[in-house]
């Protein structure tokens, strides 16, 4: 089953996915569920990525002065990230409520350049560290942790090219194409 609310040029709010995710989670647990959610997150234009109720959050400290374009963009980005945090939290709460033996893996597809307005956003032709240094975390339910031998080291260096191997390990899939040494949750150091 596939759902798409994506419209990167217009206002698209990720929280519209939350009720749909809950509906899937409430369905019969006869078979395991694997749900992939691709959020708009903080894709430019940032002001289209959060609800009106967040418009006053993260007003620049210097709000009594006229803000620079850079400060305005950074405030909009911070609000988009706040909204992404809210959506991820709601997804985890829903998974925790409806799927006792579960895990949620979050990874951003890229970061954004905010300091150099000439390179605003993300562009592989003008890549900066902030475009490649991205959030990545694994939440596990208590039941999942108790039944699992997974070890997650959040400080390990990792390339998202190897996400396939981490997903295979989480889902306990063995195949010739899987190299568990490239998994972020595998105990040994990755070979890259």
Segments from the language model and where they lie:
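Catalytic domains that recognize anionic headgroups
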Residues: 2, 6-188, 192
């Amino acid at each position: 089953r596939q759902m798409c609310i994506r419209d990167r040029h217009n206002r698209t709010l990720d929280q519209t996915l939350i009720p749909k995710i809950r509906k899937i989670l409430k369905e019969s647990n006869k078979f395991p569920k694997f749900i992939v959610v691709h959020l708009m997150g903080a894709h430019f234009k940032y002001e289209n990525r959060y609800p009106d109720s967040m418009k006053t959050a993260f007003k620049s400290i210097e709000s009594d002065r006229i803000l620079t374009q850079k400060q305005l963009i950074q405030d909009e980005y911070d609000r988009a990230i706040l909204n992404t945090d809210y959506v991820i939290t709601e997804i985890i709460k829903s998974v925790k409520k409806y799927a006792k033996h579960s895990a949620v893996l979050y990874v951003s597809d890229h970061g954004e350049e905010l300091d150099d307005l000439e390179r605003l956003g993300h562009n592989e032709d003008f890549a900066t560290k902030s475009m490649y240094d991205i959030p990545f975390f694994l939440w596990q339910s208590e039941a999942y942790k108790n039944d699992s031998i997974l070890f997650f080291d959040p400080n390990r260096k990792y390339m998202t090219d190897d996400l396939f191997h981490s997903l295979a390990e989480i889902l306990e899939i063995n195949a010739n194409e899987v190299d568990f040494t490239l998994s972020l949750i595998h105990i040994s150091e990755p070979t890259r």
